[in-house]
């Protein structure tokens, strides 16, 4: 029988799932776990028995994969009709862009059969790293954190040499809920400024991967995103990713630093570092109001990362499309970009909600 228990320190926003048998799990049972994950934000499924192929078959039942870099790439080059090889072969595309595309391909991107599942690994084949975030620890971050239309969920399946490393989680909802009504109202109005800062997520990252992270994390300088947003399940928390936030709109640099440091101090207690117990553990987590990090020995470590929308769960949980923001013009900017991304992903046979 499946056993579900709370993860320590996360104040009810995280669960362990044990004794799950994917070979005999019904579709309804799996979808129910998906709805639970949306509401709990962090789910750690121990000892899954999944490999990269079965992982993709299972996780895509919750939602379609999305990589904003790939979608916006095709929007910039519509004549390529979604064919990355045409972009690489074109004389109209800069060599810098081509290097980033090749890096994205090398770590598993641009592969529709696997849902753009990316490898996270320091392993090398013929002297080349086969995955992104190859070496060392990763500092607190969320993916696409400086993108107004960030992808809201991440699934990470272990594969090889995982048990000397940890993945940590920081949930922001309990901190936000602990504040006074007046302070929450102040935070609700605040806008953070995001920029890509080399080395802020993975100190010592090699140049090609740094360029890929720039496109992935914060493609446009001085992007404005509200501090307080809601998760796909409607949970309010902070979209405060340490790796891309460089200031608060309307505040001086010194005041921003003091304010953001106070937030970091308040959030620090709502963290949990999961030291992988099995190579095939599966971690599924919110990417809107939760940050994550990596600790420990990453030598020859290999895992698979699937980034996705809750395409087949969203209406079951909230009865409406997911829009993180209540403030304008950010709500409209999100809708516009999501419609553009949805249009570009039609070439992959994907159908995203039309936002109005």
Short names for language-model regions:
Residues 2-278, 288-356:
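Non-heme Fe(II) oxygenase catalytic core, chiefly the N-lobe of the double-stranded beta-helix
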Residues 284-286:
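Short beta-strand segments
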Residues 281:
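Conserved acidic residues
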């Amino acid at each position: 029988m499946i056993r579900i228990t709370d993860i320590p320190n996360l104040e009810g926003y995280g669960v362990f799932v044990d004794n799950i048998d994917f070979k005999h799990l019904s579709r309804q049972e799996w979808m129910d776990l998906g709805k639970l994950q949306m509401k709990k934000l962090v789910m750690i499924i121990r000892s899954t028995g999944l490999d990269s192929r079965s992982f993709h078959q299972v996780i895509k039942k919750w939602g379609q994969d999305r990589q904003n870099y790939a979608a916006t790439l095709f929007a910039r080059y519509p004549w390529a009709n979604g064919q990355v090889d045409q972009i690489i072969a074109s004389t109209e595309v800069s060599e810098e862009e081509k290097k980033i595309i090749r890096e994205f391909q090398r770590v598993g991107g641009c592969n529709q059969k696997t849902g753009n599942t990316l490898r996270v690994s320091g392993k090398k084949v013929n002297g080349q790293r086969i995955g992104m975030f190859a070496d060392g620890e990763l500092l607190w971050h969320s993916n696409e954190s400086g993108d107004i239309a960030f992808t809201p969920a991440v699934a990470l399946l272990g594969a090889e040499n995982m048990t000397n490393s940890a993945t940590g989680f920081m949930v922001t909802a309990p901190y936000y809920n602990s504040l006074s009504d007046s302070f929450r109202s102040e935070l609700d109005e605040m806008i953070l400024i995001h920029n890509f800062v080399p080395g802020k997520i993975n100190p010592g990252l090699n140049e090609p991967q740094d360029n890929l992270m720039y496109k992935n994390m914060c493609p446009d300088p001085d992007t404005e995103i509200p501090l307080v947003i809601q998760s796909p399940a409607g949970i309010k928390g902070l979209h405060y990713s340490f790796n891309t936030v460089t200031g608060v709109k309307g505040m001086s640099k010194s005041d921003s630093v003091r304010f953001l440091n106070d937030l970091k101090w308040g959030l620090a207690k709502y963290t949990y570092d999961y030291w992988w117990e099995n190579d095939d553990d599966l971690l599924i987590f919110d990417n809107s109001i939760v940050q994550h990090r990596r600790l420990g020995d990453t030598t020859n470590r290999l895992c698979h990362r699937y980034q996705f929308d809750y395409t087949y769960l969203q209406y079951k949980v909230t009865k409406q499309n997911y829009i993180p923001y209540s403030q304008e013009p950010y709500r409209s900017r999100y809708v516009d970009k999501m419609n553009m991304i949805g249009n570009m992903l039609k070439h992959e046979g994907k159908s995203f909600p039309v936002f109005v």
